[in-house]
Amino acid sequence: MKFSISSLKQVQPILCFKNKLSKVNVNSFLHPKEKVIFVMGATGSGKSRLAIDLATRFQGEIINSDKIQLYKGLDVLTNKVTPKECRGVPHHLLGVFDSEAGNLTATQYSRLASQAISKLSANNKLPIVAGGSNSYIEALVNHSSGFLLNNYDCCFIWVDVSLPVLNSFVSKRVDRMMEAGLLEEVREVFNPKANYSVGIRRAIGVPELHEYLRNESLVDRATKSKMLDVAVKNIKKNTEILACRQLKKIQRLHKKWKMSMHRVDATEVFLKRNVEEQDEAWENLVARPSERIVDKFYNNNNQLKNDDVEHCLAASYGGGSGSRAHNMI
C-alpha cells in the first residue's frame, strides 16, 4: 500500500510490542530525543579526562557540574583542567562566577545547565555534563519542570575506583598540588575574617590552612612546619571523606537510574607504575568501553529496526514497509 507523508500526520498508529497495545505518535518514534551524557565519579577518579575523551570522539562540549569549579580562581586547589588537558574542548560553567559570589543553589544550577544543554544541542554538539557535585546532577535530572527527561535521552557513565586505591591517589595528588603552588594560591585569597561556608572558600584546603596562614608570621620555623603538616594531613583526610560521601551518593543514584547508568572500573589504571602503562590501561579499560557505551546509546535510540517500522506501518495502514535510520555521530 502506498502512503504519503501527509497521511502519517493524520493517523495515530497503534503499535504492538510484546503483545501490549500502546498509542505512540509516529513523529516521536521517527524523531527521537536529543542526547545528553553524564560522566560521574568520586573526586580524583578521572571524570574530567573521560569527559574530554568522549567530547573529542563524539563532537561534544562539556558542562561543569562541580559546585566549587563554578568559581574563578584557585585553579590548583580546585583541580580545574588546564588548557592543555582540555585539548581544545570547550567547557561551560567553569570558572564563571566571582570568588566572592554566594552559593549557587541546585535549582539555579539546573536552570543554567539546562540553558547550556539546549544551546549545545541546537548547534549539533553533544552535551557532556561532568563533575563531582552529584546533588547538582540529581537536581538537573529530576527538576520539577521536567525539561531534561521530556526533551532528552540520558546516559550516565560512572567512573569507579576502589576506595583504598583512590584514597592513596588523592593523598599523592595533594602532595603534587602543594608542589604546584597550592599554599601560595590560598595565601593570596586568605582573609582571617572570611566565611568558609560561602563561595569558593568552601573548597577543601582553604579552611584547613586558616590556622597556619593566620599564625605563620608569629611562630618559629619548627612550629610553622608542624602546623603546615597538620593542615596538609587535614586536607588529605577531608578529601578522602568527600570521596567516600560522593561514592555513597553515586551508589544510591545507581540503584535509582540503573537502566541508564554504566559503571566503568578504572581501578587497574591507578595501580599501574608508570605513565605509559597508565595511559594504555586507561584507553583499554575506560576510554574505549565508554566510547562503546555512548556509541550503543546513540544507535539503539536513533536507529529504527526494520521490524519496528514494518510493525508501525502495518498497524496503521494494514500493510507496507519502510525504514529510516538516524545516526547522530
Swiss-Prot record:
<keyword id="KW-0496">Mitochondrion</keyword>
<comment type="similarity">
    <text>Belongs to the IPP transferase family.</text>
</comment>
<comment type="function">
    <text>Involved in cytokinin biosynthesis. Catalyzes the transfer of an isopentenyl group from dimethylallyl diphosphate (DMAPP) to ATP and ADP.</text>
</comment>
<keyword id="KW-0808">Transferase</keyword>
<dbReference type="Pfam" id="PF01715">
    <property type="entry name" value="IPPT"/>
</dbReference>
<dbReference type="GO" id="GO:0009860">
    <property type="term" value="P:pollen tube growth"/>
</dbReference>
<dbReference type="InterPro" id="IPR027417">
    <property type="entry name" value="P-loop_NTPase"/>
</dbReference>
<protein>
    <recommendedName>
        <fullName>Adenylate isopentenyltransferase 7, mitochondrial</fullName>
        <ecNumber>2.5.1.112</ecNumber>
    </recommendedName>
</protein>
<dbReference type="GO" id="GO:0009824">
    <property type="term" value="F:AMP dimethylallyltransferase activity"/>
</dbReference>
<keyword id="KW-0547">Nucleotide-binding</keyword>
<feature type="binding site">
    <location>
        <begin position="41"/>
        <end position="48"/>
    </location>
    <ligand>
        <name>ATP</name>
    </ligand>
</feature>
<keyword id="KW-0067">ATP-binding</keyword>
<dbReference type="GO" id="GO:0005739">
    <property type="term" value="C:mitochondrion"/>
</dbReference>
<dbReference type="GO" id="GO:0052622">
    <property type="term" value="F:ATP/ADP dimethylallyltransferase activity"/>
</dbReference>
<dbReference type="InterPro" id="IPR039657">
    <property type="entry name" value="Dimethylallyltransferase"/>
</dbReference>
<dbReference type="GO" id="GO:0009691">
    <property type="term" value="P:cytokinin biosynthetic process"/>
</dbReference>
<keyword id="KW-0203">Cytokinin biosynthesis</keyword>
<dbReference type="GO" id="GO:0005524">
    <property type="term" value="F:ATP binding"/>
</dbReference>
<feature type="transit peptide" description="Mitochondrion">
    <location>
        <begin position="1"/>
        <end position="40"/>
    </location>
</feature>
<keyword id="KW-0809">Transit peptide</keyword>
